Every structure is written in C-alpha cells, then in structure tokens.
Amino acid sequence: ELAVEWGTAVTPEAVKEALDADEDIKAITVVHNETSTGVAAPIKEIGKVMKDYDALYIVDTVSSLGGDDARVDEFGIDICVTGSQKCLAAPPGMAAITLSDDAWDKAENVNPNTFYLDMKAYRKSGDKNPPESPYTPSHATIKLQKLL
C-alpha cells in the first residue's frame, strides 16, 4: 500500500520509489479524482513512470471520466474502470472497464478467483454477434443498448 496524506495526490516519484522497492508488485491502482476532496492524481505523469515496469496500471475514473482528461491509451493505462453514477451523471447501475492488450494478455493466463468479474467471460460474450452480457445485465444496460 502506498498511502498519501488526506487531501493530497500520489506523486509519480512515490510510485517509482514503491515499484523500485518491491519488484513483486503486479499492479498499481490509482484513484484519478478523489470525490470528497476533489484532489486529482497526475495519471498522465504516473503513466510515464509505469512504462518502465511490468506492473499493470489501473485507474479508477468513476468521478472523473467525462469531466477530466483520462486518455486511456495515451496515458498508458492498462485497466480503466468507471461507473455511470458520478461524473457521467447517468443513472446508477452501470460500469465500464477497458483493458489494454497487455492487460488482456495477462488476463488470459490467470484463472480468476471471481465469477462475475471474469473478464474472459465478458470478452467471449462481447465477441458474439450481436454482443451480449455473459450474465444478467442491469436494466440500465438494457436501456442503453436499445438507445444505441
């Protein structure tokens, strides 16, 4: 765990120090925008640091996607997660996740210890024509699909 003082953002230098101190780190997770304080982490700069390491770069953009700059590919983000209920100002109940090619490669070689969050199941169902959810979708997801 890399803790920072309340109301401050993690720095790229602190991330680099943590990664240098422990070569077994498999992933770094950063909250882009901390809702209660409004503090935004420098995800672009942290992404530059992450390019030198094999660890996955995971960013929580629940309260920032759509309102702040979060260019997933350009910033080197391997996994980006968001929800509909905060910055997107949509009804709650939907989540979106992106995986980089590197994250997909790593996911293919892991047997997840979770049923619902098995990304391989989502990919397999998403490749169908028409795409579908591997599990019962939320009512908001069904409505979104109809609108699109």
Show where each model-derived region lies:
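Short beta-strand segments
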Residues: L2-A3, T29-H32, T82-G83, T98
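Conserved active-site segment immediately N-terminal to the catalytic lysine
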Residues: D73-Q85
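Glycine-rich, charge-decorated loop segments at or immediately adjacent to ligand/cofactor-binding or catalytic sites
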Residues: L65-F75
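Short, acidic/turn-prone active-site loops that include or flank metal/cofactor-
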Residues: V4-E5, S63, S84-C87, D102-A103
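Generic secondary-structure signature for well-ordered alpha-helical cores
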Residues: E17-D24, K51-A55, I77, L99-W104, ...
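Active-site C-terminal subdomain of aminotransferase-like
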Residues: C87-L148
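Active-site cofactor/substrate anionic-group-binding motifs, chiefly glycine-
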Residues: E1-A9
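Active-site phosphate-binding strand-loop segment of PLP-dependent enzymes
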Residues: V10-S64, I79
